[in-house]
Curated annotation (Swiss-Prot):
Stretches that traverse the bilayer: 47-67
Protein name: Uncharacterized protein MJ1506
Subcellular location: Membrane
Bilayer disposition of the protein: Single-pass membrane protein
Length: 437
């Protein structure tokens, strides 16, 4: 049998003129290529027919759906959106009846009840060339990011065809897909890595600005406003630029706390200005709390030996403590330790540049090492302690033997007798002188 095929190169291949093995292999390859090209051509023809069918159906549809109209024109997350859809009967020969318009929203849209059946609106009929508008209401999710979101609009209707006085009804359905743009709104939070500062000091803190909203912020500017206690150093206006939703930007700033500031929380304000995706200008003010902490230094309490007195049977030791810092130290307790024995006194609070003393009585003599420990707290009840040691030497003094009480009484009696004797003798002399006269 003679097989003749025409290839792409327009050559005619005669298999009778080829060797048997070669002609068989070549025939197999060309046959597969031919079958593939043939099937591909059939598929493309079917696809073309389907597309033409859709175009024809669309062009002959009596109903035309206009693009939805909505209010507000700029949709934001959380908005309630009024939606109007206009239905036109573009067939100028036939009437359409039983028109049902259905809206199927996708996230972030949610239907509100404004029609007897949620998401469905009906039009009884439209004459040739007539139109009508149906109304729906949508709610936008508060957390919807900026982008286009889909809604499906399906219209089903009956077209009435009149021929020779006879009415024939044909049912049709049309579905169209529309996209509504939601403009997210930027919103910000600012975190500070370390909010504490010491009076009279300059500190660099980092502001972490995060866009926690649903939209992007363009031309973002940050303006920092200090107060009479906390100052902003190095410029207070900072240009950030564009900050997209869920993105953050870290800004280092320097602040200074005046020396006379008291412990507490002080606010500085961060004013933000930006342009939203909808082209509108926005602003926001965020207070930033700075905690002022007066630091207690290790050498702030000064412990000193004020006086040592030998009282014979005991020693009177006076220990002093002075607050030489700018921060109050609270609930001071002083403990003196001598030869393993503890003597404790409560002092209380010491303001800056204040001092107090405590007197301890111990019955120890000779070389005495003493250790003085003071425990105290700051304004936030954090505990501290300070310790000093002193070496003192006190000799015990022997008391002179005191006179016996009996001797004292006897002496008094003798003195009284002598006085009485002198007085009596003096009177006797006076009497004798009187008799002589």
């Amino acid at each position: 049998m003679l097989y003749i095929l025409k290839c792409k190169s327009n050559y005619i291949i005669n298999f009778h003129r080829l060797p048997q093995k070669t002609s068989k292999a070549l025939y197999t390859n060309i046959s597969l290529s031919f079958i593939y090209r043939f099937m591909w051509g059939i598929m493309m023809k079917k696809l073309l027919i389907i597309l033409i069918g859709f175009i024809l159906l669309s062009s002959i549809s009596a109903i035309q759906i206009d693009a939805p109209q909505y209010q507000p024109n700029v949709i934001h997350p959380g908005d309630d959106v009024d939606l109007w859809i206009k239905i036109n009967n573009d067939n100028y020969d036939n009437e359409v009846k039983n028109i049902v318009v259905e809206v199927t929203p996708h996230y972030p849209f949610e239907l509100r009840q404004v029609n007897p059946i949620k998401g469905k609106a009906t039009i009884s009929h439209l004459n040739p060339g007539e139109s009508d508008t149906v109304y729906f209401k949508l709610h936008v999710d508060e957390n919807a990011p900026s982008r286009d979101y889909r809604i499906d609009v399906k219209v089903s209707y009956d077209e009435v065809d009149k021929e020779d006085g006879k009415e024939t009804s044909h049912h049709y359905e049309i579905t169209k897909i529309y996209y509504l743009h939601v403009y997210g709104i930027a919103s910000f939070e600012i975190n500070i890595d370390d909010t504490s500062i010491i009076p009279g000091k300059t500190k660099t803190i980092k502001l972490d600005i995060k866009n926690v909203g649903t939209g992007n912020a363009k031309y973002l500017n940050l303006y920092l406003i200090g107060n009479d206690k906390i100052n902003i150093l190095g410029g207070s206006l900072i240009f950030v630029g564009c900050l997209k939703a869920n993105n953050q930007y870290i800004i280092p700033i320097k602040i200074y706390a005046v020396p006379e500031i008291e412990d507490g929380i002080y606010s500085i304000n961060a004013n933000l200005f930006w342009v939203g995706e909808d082209g509108k200008q926005y602003n926001s003010t965020i207070p930033l709390n700075i905690r002022v902490v007066k630091k207690i230094y290790a050498n702030q309490p000064y412990i000193y030996l004020d006086d040592v007195k030998n009282k014979g049977d005991y020693i009177e030791i006076t220990i002093g403590i002075a607050n030489r810092g700018t921060t109050k130290i609270k609930h001071c307790v002083m403990t003196l330790t001598a030869n393993g024995r503890n003597y404790t006194k409560y002092i209380g609070d010491l303001d800056e540049d204040d001092y107090d003393t405590s007197i301890f009585e111990i019955k120890e003599f000779g070389d005495i090492p003493i250790k003085v420990t003071v425990t105290y707290f700051d304004d936030y009840h954090n505990p501290y302690n300070a310790t000093e040691t002193f070496n003192i030497h006190v000799e015990k003094v022997k008391k002179e033997e005191s006179l016996s009480p009996m001797y004292i009484i006897g002496g008094v009696i003798v003195v009284i007798i002598i006085i009485l004797y002198i007085r009596k003798r003096k009177r006797h002399q006076e009497f004798e002188e009187f008799e002589e006269i």
